[in-house]
């Protein structure tokens, strides 16, 4: 049996939008004060529904067209369940089965898909403390 090596890369790019991916909170990853730009959507409170950032969708569509990708006629978001400290709500909103863009190529490198997803919180591990601190300013940013 012969094997063919296959190399896959997952590249994350932070979109330059005024608000976060699924809420109206300010998208400011340079904010020095923790947990300033957060809301019940960022924290996953019960009964609160996310609303997609139209500006982010426009950016992804431009990227897709620039790489020769195809725009999906249908898209959907999934909740990927994670049990990590930097996702206190227990899930991440992401696209997988039905991304906005599929296919394309950049500098000879084939691209499978371009999709949107929220980022996790940023965790800080201080050497002087036994616990970690979370900054939700970064959640919902990608």
Positions of predicted regions on the chain:
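Basic, nucleic-acid-interacting segments
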Residues: 1-142
């Amino acid at each position: 049996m012969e094997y063919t090596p296959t190399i896959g890369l997952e590249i994350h790019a932070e979109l330059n939008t005024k608000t976060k991916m699924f809420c109206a909170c300010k998208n400011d990853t340079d904010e020095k004060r923790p947990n300033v730009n957060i809301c019940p959507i960022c924290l996953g409170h019960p009964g609160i529904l996310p609303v997609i950032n139209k500006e982010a969708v426009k950016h992804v569509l431009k990227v897709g067209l620039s790489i020769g990708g195809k725009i999906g006629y249908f898209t959907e978001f999934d909740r990927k369940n994670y049990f990590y400290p930097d996702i206190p709500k227990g899930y991440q909103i992401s696209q997988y089965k039905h991304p906005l863009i599929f296919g394309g190529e950049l500098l000879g490198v084939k691209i499978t898909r371009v999709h949107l997803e929220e980022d996790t919180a940023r965790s800080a591990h201080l050497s002087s403390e036994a616990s970690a601190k979370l900054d939700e300013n970064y959640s919902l940013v990608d």
